[in-house]
């Protein structure tokens, strides 16, 4: 294992409980694509998590999605907020990361969250994609702790409407 990988391994050591607790808490928040209030609550959690990074964070309102109802009338469907975090945009190398924080599940009971085999969490949005967000943030956190991190810039997009086809 090279020095960078050892440094990343040290950064990740002991973080499993923190990551699982974060995932469980986030899966306990409804962030159904059409639940604008739930998306707002989830976006606030994400903004809180991004505070630990040396990144500039921008929150953008998306335009309403225009749909047609059963009577043929146009209706505006509000969407959640897009979150964009940028770290070291002047660095010689850049990485773009993107993931969504909405879920396909409408509001649900917290009882649907359960730990399987003491290690696997089964929960609405756990794999798609709140678990991916947790892993991505942990990886970024570990990366930020190694020598040479200043040579790489990154930009992270957190999308609130992927399950709808990203109309915003």
Per-region residue spans from a language model:
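Acidic/histidine-rich catalytic neighborhood of metal-dependent amide-processing enzymes
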Residues: 121-123, 127-168
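Acidic/His- and Gly-rich active-site-bordering loop/insert found
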Residues: 2-124, 145
């Amino acid at each position: 294992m090279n020095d960078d990988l050892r440094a990343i391994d040290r950064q990740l050591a002991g973080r499993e409980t923190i990551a699982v607790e974060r995932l469980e808490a986030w899966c306990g928040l409804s962030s159904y694509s059409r639940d604008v209030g739930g998306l707002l609550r989830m976006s606030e959690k994400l903004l809180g998590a991004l505070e630990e990074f040396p990144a500039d964070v921008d929150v953008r309102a998306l335009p309403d999605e225009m749909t047609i109802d059963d009577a043929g009338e146009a209706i505006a469907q509000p969407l959640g907020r897009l979150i964009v975090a940028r770290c070291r945009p002047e660095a010689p190398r850049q990485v773009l990361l993107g993931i969504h924080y909405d879920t396909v599940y409408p509001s649900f009971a917290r009882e649907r969250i359960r730990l399987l085999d003491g290690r696997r969490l089964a929960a609405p949005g756990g794999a798609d994609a709140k678990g991916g967000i947790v892993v991505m943030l942990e990886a970024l956190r570990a990366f930020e702790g190694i020598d040479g991190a200043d040579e790489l810039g990154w930009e992270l997009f957190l999308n609130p409407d992927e399950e709808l086809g990203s109309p915003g």
